[in-house]
């Protein structure tokens, strides 16, 4: 059974993916109309200018929507990992601490700097053990609790979303595009 947080993150991820795909479709439609007008006789210059502005805003909207989708995809994976590690520690935390006792013994009495060093050495030991296990080539599967959700969203976000989110905008550019986007939305709702 999934946690409420995981289910909410999954729903957000799916909604963000749908919004990103919708923005891509809107951009494609504007670009098609622009090309159709550009290749036609008796070009409507004002409509071409308007479409150039719409395309510019749509590209920004696609970029922003792709970024939201990618971040929400990462959130689903992060919540799943956190939940499963919490479950693991509930069941096996004592055994893990015992295995790492040479590094962690007396942890609560250590100074902050010494605690950080102890945790770092314990983390290094865990990393080494995990790398050794991975080197055996064992098959890795999603946990049974989260398998449906993780399989649905996929191992990584869609490659196209990564490409769509590559361009970075300054805060000033984001403000300008946000304003243009609101103006475009108000014109289209009339």
UniProtKB/Swiss-Prot annotation:
GO terms for biological process: symbiont-mediated activation of host transcription. The keyword Nucleus does not apply. Late protein which functions to suppress polarity of amber mutations in the late genes of the P2 helper phage. Gene3D superfamilies: Phage polarity suppression protein monomer. It comes from the Viruses. Keywords: Late protein. It comes from Enterobacteria phage P4. This is Polarity suppression protein. The keyword Cell membrane does not apply.
């Amino acid at each position: 059974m999934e946690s409420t947080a995981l289910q909410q993150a999954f729903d957000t991820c799916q909604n963000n993916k749908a919004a990103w795909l919708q923005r891509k479709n809107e951009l494609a439609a504007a670009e098609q109309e622009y090309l159709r007008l550009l290749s036609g006789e008796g070009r409507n210059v004002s409509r071409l200018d308007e479409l150039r502005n719409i395309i510019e805003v749509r590209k920004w909207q696609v970029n922003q929507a792709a970024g939201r989708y990618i971040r929400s995809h990462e959130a689903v994976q992060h919540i799943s990992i956190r939940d499963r590690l919490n479950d693991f520690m509930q069941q096996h935390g004592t055994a893990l601490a015992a295995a790492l006792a040479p590094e962690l013994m007396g942890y609560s009495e250590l100074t902050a700097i010494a605690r950080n060093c102890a945790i770092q050495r314990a983390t290094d030991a865990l990393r080494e053990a995990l790398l050794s296990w991975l080197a055996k080539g064992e098959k890795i599967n999603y946990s049974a609790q989260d398998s449906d959700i993780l399989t649905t969203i996929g191992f990584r976000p869609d490659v196209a979303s990564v490409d769509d989110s590559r361009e970075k905008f300054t805060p000033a550019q984001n403000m300008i595009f946000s304003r243009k986007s609101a103006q475009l939305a108000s014109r289209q709702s009339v």
